[in-house]
Amino acid sequence: MGERTPLALLDAPASGRMAIGEALTNILCADVESLGEVKLSANWMVAAGYDTEDDKLYKTVEAVAMTLCPQLGICIPVGKDSMSMRTVWEQEGEALSNTAPLSLVISAFAPLQDIRGTLTPELKTTADDTQLVLVDLGRGKNRLGGSALGQVFRTLDGTAPDLDSASDMLALFSLLKAARSEGILLAYHDRADGGLLTTAVEMAFAGRCGVTLDLASAAPIEALFSEELGIVVQIRRADSGRFTELANEAGLGDCTHTIAAVEANDAGRENPRLTVLSCGETLYSASLSSLQRTWAETSYHMQKLRDNSDCAQEEYDSLLDTKNPGLNAALSFDVNEDIAAPYIATGVRPKVAVLREQGVNGQIEMAAAFDRAGFEAIDVHMTDLLQGRRSLEEFSTLVACGGFSYGDVLGAGGGWAKTILFNDALRAQFEAFFANPNTLSLGVCNGCQMLSHLSELIPGANNWPSFQRNRSEQFEGRLSLVRIENSNSAFMHDMQGSRFAIAVAHGEGRASFASSADAEAFAASNSAAMRYVDASGEKTMRYPANPNGASDAIAGLSSVDGRVTLMMPHPERVFRASQNSWHPEDWKEDAPSMRLFRNARRWHG
């Protein structure tokens, strides 16, 4: 996406060109085959009829649609507009108004041949001797008009940055294409809001490593805070010469500069720092933990007012842990081994009922995961069972998928469960399925909540917890670290002790027991199959590592015999390595979550 609305107060056409430029420098982190394949959606907002806003709109549309986009060879096939960005009212006899500046918000889209070629801002600390290189499409102008720095000092003085040359954007695409094909690029971030300093800090946050910026500039303020278009890439120092050659070939050699050194091989991980040098002099140095707390402070204060204040404080305080390695993985099995392969080779594909109800939305990913593991995934809606088009007798495995059945208005999963409990035929059908020793059942997220309401029908489900509103009092959508526990769950066979990241997305995921006696009985049964853990692998009650405040950090559980497994996290959303926003480099096609589905296939033999 791209938007540079504040610039419209200085130069409306420049704000439009910069919005497109920002959208493009964002999307070029992905391996786009050709710039012509990029399509734009334009959202125009203006106070039509007010002052000179109509003239600004005309000139900006002309600059964007009639000049820049044709020069770039891209088009804007879709968009929308809001033409009444002004409100007028009277207060105590005085006429008042509030008018928004002309705004253009650009969304860029492009097909990809392989999403695994997408670069992220995460600095690679395992690579020896790396550096950051700036490709400055502003070509040293460093215009500060409309910048975040100007907003801090309440001034709009100065000249607005601009995309002065469409040919430079085309050249940038060519440079990235060539460098990517030679495997030179390790990390990527665009320069935008906040300027070069913010870009470097965000890359350091993502990589959890120190960065030393070295500015060969007599005007460090402009160099650090101008929001000219540009990108910053991480490359190996050994590739520096080749990258310079490619930049020269693209016509960008004179605006390509080495700007920083990156700490390598985990050096400084315990207390990494950002240091800014200019002409050999240290201008600034601070720990990443202090910078990240500053970066998060405004959000923290808002969160403390809106959400559970204790959770807000715990999340903010977690930034003080300088030893926190962030997301990590430690597995007790080979993630690249396909243990289901021998069973798939037989040609037998057990049928799994991918069960859904009104409001459920996770059935496609779930079917894909089971299909990859060697099952025949069949879409089964509750109405299919109610009207007799399908019966659970046809299946050896049942999976209840995630979503928001009946909008959670009867409690998460409650309405779905009552459809079964209050219908004699359905109740008998589910009870018979759960009692059959040759069946497996899985409930994920909303399906987990639903199956927990059916515990009276499930053998060995005594003392199961219910799932209540998150402690944070908010919907939680994030990657959380979990640890596989020692349980009888058929889905988690031979995974005990493994720690990895998994997707969570729920508003009512807090496992809660009706009494301390139930909690003690549950613990004695070894039915806890998965727990939320911190970065060191220890179960935790602290937010956000425990995203919902679950009792005893319970993320998943099983029946005593292990045939029925429930979990709030979503393994089906991250079963491929490429679905994870971060993963170790030695993971090939599959992620640890895929093992759950392959264990189910192995269980069937």
Regions of interest found by a model, annotated:
Residues 3-10, 47-55, 152-165, 417-421, ...:
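Glycine-rich tight-turn/loop motif centered on a GG-T
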Residues 5-8, 32, 58-59, 75-225, ...:
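Intein/HINT protein-splicing elements and their conserved insertion hotspots or analogous self-processing inserts
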Residues 9-86:
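A glycine-rich phosphate/pyrophosphate-binding beta-strand-loop-alpha-helix module
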Residues 32, 69, 96-100, 122-126, ...:
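Solvent-exposed alpha-helices and their adjacent loops that cap or buttress functional pockets
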Residues 39, 75, 438-440, 563:
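Proline-centered loop/turn at the N-terminus of a beta-strand
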Residues 232-236:
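Short hydrophobic/aromatic beta-strand micro-patches
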Residues 278-444, 448-460, 468-476, 551, ...:
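N-terminal beta1-alpha1 cap of cysteine-dependent amidohydrolase-like domains
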Residues 388-390, 427, 431-432, 464-605:
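Amide-donor transfer/coupling interface in amidating biosynthetic enzymes
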